[in-house]
Amino acid sequence: MFHILNKGSSKSCIYTRPCLKRFYHQHYEHTGKLSRTFFSPTHIKYNRLSTLDTSTSTANAAPDPQVLTFLSKRMQAAPLYPKPSAFLELGKPRLTVLVVLSTMSSYALAPYPGLSFNTLAWLTMGTALCSISANAFNQSMEPMLDCQMARTRSRPIPRGAIRPEYAWLFATLTGIAGTSMSFLVNPTVGWLGLGNIVLYMGIYTPLKRISIVNTWVGSLVGAIPPLMGWAACSGGDLLSHPGGLITAAMLFAWQFPHFNAFSTMVKDDYKKCGYQMMAWKNPALNARVSLRYALAFLPLSYAYISTGLVGPWYAVPATGTNMFLIARAWKFYRNRNYQNARSLFFASLLHLPLLFTLTLACHMIKVWNDSDSKNPVLGSEEDTLKY
């Protein structure tokens, strides 16, 4: 139990004043030693959740009864009219923005004439709502597990900001709206959007407590948005040009160094809740897979050159950017400690946006250079100029 030791008093009390922005919070650990840790006001507000003893949970054990009781009370106390911010949190806005950016990047990279603002608008809104729906479904299915992990216990449902039935309704409505908008682009985009929601909610989420294969399934979820962007630009054709599949393969490969590093940082929480992750089930495999897929970026980047999407000069910045990620994946492979995992995680956050920015820049340079002659990728000279 976390306590504040009052000056001049041998008694301790729970500190409840929300006016202080930051303060020293003293508590006894299980070892009996006194330590000091900075806690933010958000942590103070939900510190009762952190005091619940969930250390005895295992992969096959039921949630602690104390956790069930506390969560039940929180859900019952949830407001009848939740704040809009609670719905926003259900959709994980930062993750949704990244998903939309990957879709738009693929749309911009596709070498097809007649790019349409209306198509891009429907694609953007449809992708965003599909992502919001999948994230909301995920949180609706796992409140019991979310309240046991430090990084997720302040989500809307565990902290009592929104009722579970409202979360389910929100996920359903955004899913219907998102897939409807995606179908307005073309049927291929619509089916990809719907399939991604089903894959995330129906397969990936329950598989997390069954097998480490969940990481590969989750990577498929991340690879679908670029296919949606490519299909939107190509009229639903994903096979006549390999660029869309290459972009999707990049997003698939990126998930492994990114997520494997992150799961290493929070592996104790995952183990406590029974999530079957390589980080604690097989740490050596976890590091090998991270390095393997980091190395995959080299041939995937060069594949862009062979398809004519970018010029040969693209190899220089692409190689440098990929080596930035590979170097940290190699360090993590050699020494699987927290520091190297953290370094790889933040490197992955920089790597993908930088690589896509370079790819789009080199693609546009090639388009401009080829604008006065017929381009075999774009088709006729007239289409090239229109593009």
Swiss-Prot record:
Reactions catalysed: heme b + (2E,6E)-farnesyl diphosphate + H2O = Fe(II)-heme o + diphosphate
GO molecular function ontology, one term from the record: protoheme IX farnesyltransferase activity
EC main group: transferase
Membrane topology per record: Multi-pass membrane protein
GO cellular component, one term: mitochondrial inner membrane
UniProtKB keywords: Heme biosynthesis, Membrane, Mitochondrion, Transferase, Transit peptide, Transmembrane, Transmembrane helix
Subcellular compartments: Mitochondrion membrane
Single GO BP term: heme A biosynthetic process
InterPro entries: Protohaem_IX_farnesylTrfase, Protohaem_IX_farnesylTrfase_mt, UbiA_prenyltransferase, UbiA_prenylTrfase_CS, UbiA_sf
Transmembrane segments: 95-115, 117-137, 183-203, 212-232, 242-262, 284-306, 311-330, 345-365
EC number: 2.5.1.141
PROSITE patterns in the cross-refs: UBIA
Family to which this protein belongs: Belongs to the UbiA prenyltransferase family.
HAMAP family (alphabetical): CyoE_CtaB
UniProt function note: Converts protoheme IX and farnesyl diphosphate to heme O.
Protein name: Protoheme IX farnesyltransferase, mitochondrial
Species: Schizosaccharomyces pombe (strain 972 / ATCC 24843)
